[in-house]
């Protein structure tokens, strides 16, 4: 009790003392704050500061040594120890030491700051490496297979580390330069990122094409990608033609109405503005900048002395050169993507199932498009898999394919004969008065060619059903047949057209002779009347009254423009009637009709890939050929492609349905590019023929007054270049040599690119084949091991009382082998494993009758591990491993 009383009193005194001490400290703090505000320090504070200074001096004297040299040595040793530590550890140690350090160590903080500022080169290098590693972690953090919580934590720590220690690299020598380099690096990274985003945003119609691809597959989207590429090509050609030919003539040439070639003839002026005349590109359209005959033959025009005839010829040929370069470059770039569109990789469906979704999508519409795109890609892969597993009668299939090709050849021959006959009829109509002809007779050629391009592709598609190719291969055959159709029609048209040109040249010679005789008669009469032989003024005849030649170049240009415009009209009307009106009928009349309009006839239309692609390619061929005779044709084609993108995208999304067998398109459009390259060469030949062979018209165009069009080049060489250059060009400008060398170089380039592409594809296929062989060999090894174990188990059952079975080793006792279940049934062929490879004996087939089960008298063995994937569950056949494991109950 006494002890408790003493303890209680001691606690009371302690509590009272603590409370009194707190009150005194509170009073002292208040008085100190008041005196600080008044600017007068407290006497107690002065004594405390003096005491602290004495303690600091004593601590430095005890720890640092008795001299300045000793203190410097201690400081140097401490600095060396800190250098051995990593930078983050050093910082942590510094923080810990600062927390442990007493208030008396505040005076040494300046020394630590001086140590920070004087880092060695090794520390700087280590710090740079760690900062770069953190930056790489920030850049590649998205690819890490971590949880989002861990990613955010690592990102925050890495960013704090970079922000903290990146500034330390700039301390000391070269601080400003390093800070400037860091700032410029960050600015450059941000600029590159913004520029990439800007380039992506500047890709025209990207979102529209992605939407089409998500609903209709990559095969339909490949057409719109090709259409966008064609639009870019024609935009560049439009810039060349208008910038170097049309605009110089408009700004620096002779104004309209001053010379006969820029004036409507007197007999045509009354009907020059009629719609029927303008619709056929006659009247004022014929004598405008759209066509060849409008341009003057002056060697130089304007104050710039611009050589318009030379520019016209070089631009007309340069269009082909630029197009050839772009097409070959695109084919070479696409060759690396390679393949025929089939996915030759393994585990296709697993990759699509687990990696198709984009988890950064935040827009519901984008999510719907991505869902549709994933579904379509599964359909494409299923079609490829079905085609690989298809079994067919090869002899019947060959017969049907031969029959289909014979029918298609008959169609091609009939279409060519029809076009030739129609062009011959049009030549007969041209000799008659145009007022006596009907609209059908005037436009018979264009109508027949457009109708053949409209009717033959569906006919070819119906015949191709006999062949039963894979959809991708069937598309290539369809493209080739329509290509042959369009090519035959086009060249039949050209042959007939050049026959007409020869007739116009004969007519032009007669008109030229009449004009020459009229001028000679005028000069002779003027000389006799005024007795003057020099400085005779030309005849005062109005430009509209001058006798004109037929100007065959303008007539050829008009034919190409009419073909292009009629093709646009037929295409748009086909979409409007065949797709839109058909979709309206199916959509609104399906509820009140006798049969199901969606499932039966007429149903919704499918997008015709082959017809649209070939139409686009041959329309471009007509642009290449017609641009030399009608410079305004390139501008018309640019407007056509621009409107086609919006019009056809709307028609596909609103009126069409996906193909019944959705297939994957080629990862590169090289098949389309190959057809385009062939059309480019075929389009170049008529233009080269007219430049090198046919004489230009004498009263229209920039080459009038010359024997051949290429004489402009020789004239420029003779008048603008030194004489020795003229000799060199005269030897090198042999037309046969030039054409042969150009064609040889082009074909060599194509052969080289094709060979390189095939070599890369073959090497890739060989590597894939080797990898597949190794994988199959590994599977066979595993399956053979399993089947061998099964045979050995069955042989064990045949041995009497298992007297010949060797005793199991220690390892086998510890790790018993897994055995399949007796009750499970094996499906498939006998002797085939589950994967289709290796030797595998059926489990239901036994080599002999089962031995009688002996009673189990030993202790149960260790429990077996669970079955592997693909193996059945349940007890194994044969003698049990222990009590209650498949054998009879033990006898008691």
From Swiss-Prot:
InterPro entries the record matches: TMC, TMC_dom
Superkingdom: Eukaryota
Record key words, sorted: Membrane, Transmembrane, Transmembrane helix
Transmembrane segments: 235-255, 275-295, 308-328, 403-423, 444-464, 482-502, 616-636, 671-691, 736-756
GO molecular function: mechanosensitive monoatomic ion channel activity
Record-linked Pfam families: TMC (PF07810)
Organ and tissue specificity: In adults, expression is restricted to the hair cells of inner ear and lateral line organ. Expressed at higher levels in the larval lateral-line neuromasts than in the larval inner ear.
Annotated Gene Ontology cellular component terms: plasma membrane
Annotated compartments: Membrane
UniProt feature, compositional bias: Basic and acidic residues: 772-785
GO biological process: detection of mechanical stimulus involved in sensory perception of sound; inner ear development; inner ear morphogenesis; neuromast development; vestibular reflex
Low complexity: bias regions: 103-112
Annotated coiled-coil segments of the chain: none
Amino acid composition bias (Pro residues), ranges on this chain: 862-878
Ranges of Basic residues composition bias in the record: 48-58, 66-77
Region (Disordered): 29-125, 772-791, 796-892
Disulfide bonds, paired cysteine numbers: none
Membrane topology: Multi-pass membrane protein
Family to which this protein belongs: Belongs to the TMC family.
Purpose: Probable component of the mechanotransducer (MET) non-selective cation channel.
Name the record gives this protein: Transmembrane channel-like protein 2-B
Record lineage: Eukaryota, Metazoa, Chordata, Craniata, Vertebrata
């Amino acid at each position: 009790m006494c002890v408790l009383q003493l303890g209680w009193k001691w606690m009371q005194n302690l509590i009272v003392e603590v409370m009194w001490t707190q009150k005194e400290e509170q009073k002292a703090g208040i008085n100190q704050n008041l005196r600080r505000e008044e600017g007068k320090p407290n006497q107690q504070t002065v004594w405390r500061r003096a005491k602290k200074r004495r303690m600091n001096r004593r601590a430095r004297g005890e720890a640092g040594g008795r001299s300045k040299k000793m203190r410097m040595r201690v400081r140097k040793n401490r600095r060396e120890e800190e250098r051995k530590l990593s930078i983050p550890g050093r910082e942590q140690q510094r923080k810990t030491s600062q927390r442990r350090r007493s208030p008396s160590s505040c005076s040494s903080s300046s020394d630590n700051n001086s140590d920070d500022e004087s880092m060695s080169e090794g520390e700087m290098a280590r710090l740079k490496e760690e900062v770069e590693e953190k930056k790489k972690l920030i850049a590649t953090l998205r690819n890490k297979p971590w949880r989002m919580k861990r990613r955010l934590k690592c990102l925050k720590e890495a960013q704090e580390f970079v922000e903290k220690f990146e500034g330390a690299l700039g301390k000391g020598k070269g601080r400003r330069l390093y800070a400037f380099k860091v700032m410029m690096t960050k600015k450059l990274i941000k600029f590159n990122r913004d520029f990439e985003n800007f380039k992506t945003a500047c890709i025209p119609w990207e979102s529209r094409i992605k939407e089409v691809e998500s609903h209709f597959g990559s095969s339909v989207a490949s057409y719109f990608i090709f259409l966008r590429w064609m639009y870019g090509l024609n935009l560049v050609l439009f810039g060349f033609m208008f910038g170097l030919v049309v605009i110089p003539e408009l700004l620096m040439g002779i104004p309209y109405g001053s010379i006969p070639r820029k004036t409507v003839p007197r007999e045509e002026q009354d009907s020059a503005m009629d719609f029927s005349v303008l619709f056929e590109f006659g009247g004022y359209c014929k004598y405008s900048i759209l066509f060849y005959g409008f341009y003057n033959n002056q060697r130089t025009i304007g104050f710039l002395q611009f050589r318009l005839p030379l520019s016209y010829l070089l631009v007309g040929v340069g269009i082909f050169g630029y197009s050839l370069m772009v097409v070959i470059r695109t084919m070479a770039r696409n060759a690396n993507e390679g393949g025929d569109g089939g996915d030759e990789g393994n585990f296709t469906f697993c990759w699509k199932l687990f990696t198709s979704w984009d988890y950064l999508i935040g827009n519901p519409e984008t999510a719907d498009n991505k869902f549709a795109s994933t579904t379509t890609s599964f359909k494409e892969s299923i079609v490829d898999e079905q085609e690989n597993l298809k079994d067919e009668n090869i002899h019947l299939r060959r017969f049907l394919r031969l029959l289909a090709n014979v029918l298609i050849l008959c169609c091609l021959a009939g279409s060519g004969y029809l076009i030739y006959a129609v062009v011959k009829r049009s030549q007969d109509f041209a000799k008659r008065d145009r007022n006596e002809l009907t609209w059908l007779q005037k436009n018979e050629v264009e109508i027949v060619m457009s109708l053949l391009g409209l009717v033959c592709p569906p006919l070819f598609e119906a015949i191709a059903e006999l062949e039963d190719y894979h959809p991708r291969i069937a598309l290539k055959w369809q493209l080739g047949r329509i290509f042959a159709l369009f090519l035959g029609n086009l060249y039949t048209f050209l042959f007939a057209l050049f026959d007409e040109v020869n007739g116009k040249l004969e007519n032009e010679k007669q008109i030229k002779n009449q004009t020459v005789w009229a001028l000679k008669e005028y000069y002779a009469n003027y000389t006799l009347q005024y007795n003057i032989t020099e400085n005779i003024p030309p005849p005062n005849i109005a430009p509209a009254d001058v006798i004109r030649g037929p100007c065959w170049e303008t007539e050829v240009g008009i034919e190409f423009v009419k073909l292009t415009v009629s093709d646009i009209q037929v295409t748009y009307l086909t979409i409007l009637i065949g797709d839109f009106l058909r979709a309206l009928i199916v959509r609104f009349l399906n509820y009140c009709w006798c049969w199901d309009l969606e499932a039966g006839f007429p149903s919704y239309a499918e997008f015709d890939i082959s017809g649209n692609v070939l139409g686009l390619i041959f329309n471009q061929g007509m642009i290449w050929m017609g641009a030399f005779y009608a410079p305004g044709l390139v501008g018309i084609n640019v407007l056509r492609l621009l409107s086609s993108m919006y019009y056809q995208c709307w028609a596909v999304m609103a009126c069409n349905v996906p193909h019944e067998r959705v297939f994957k398109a080629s990862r590169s459009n090289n098949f389309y590019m190959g057809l385009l390259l062939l059309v480019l060469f075929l389009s170049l030949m008529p233009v080269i023929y007219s430049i090198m062979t046919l004489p230009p018209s004498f009263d229209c165009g920039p080459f009038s007054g010359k024997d051949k069009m290429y004489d402009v080049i020789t004239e420029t060489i003779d008048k603008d270049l030194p004489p020795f250059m003229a000799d060199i060009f005269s030897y090198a400008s042999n037309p046969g040599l030039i054409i042969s060398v150009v064609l040889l170089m082009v074909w060599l380039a194509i052969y080289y690119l094709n060979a390189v592409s095939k070599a890369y594809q073959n090497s890739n296929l060989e590597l894939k084949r080797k990898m597949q062989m190794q994988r199959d060999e590994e599977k066979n090894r595993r399956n053979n091991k399993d089947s061998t174990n099964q045979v050995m188990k069955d042989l064990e059952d045949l041995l009497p009382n298992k007297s010949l079975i060797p005793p199991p080793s220690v390892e086998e006792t510890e790790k018993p082998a897994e055995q399949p279940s007796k009750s499970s049934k094996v499906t498939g062929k006998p002797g085939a494993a589950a994967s289709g490879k290796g030797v595998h004996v059926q489990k239901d087939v036994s080599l002999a009758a089962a031995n009688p089960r002996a009673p189990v008298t030993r202790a149960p063995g260790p429990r077996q591990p669970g079955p592997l994937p693909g193996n059945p569950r349940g007890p194994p056949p044969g003698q049990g491993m222990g009590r209650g494991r498949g054998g009879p109950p033990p006898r008691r």
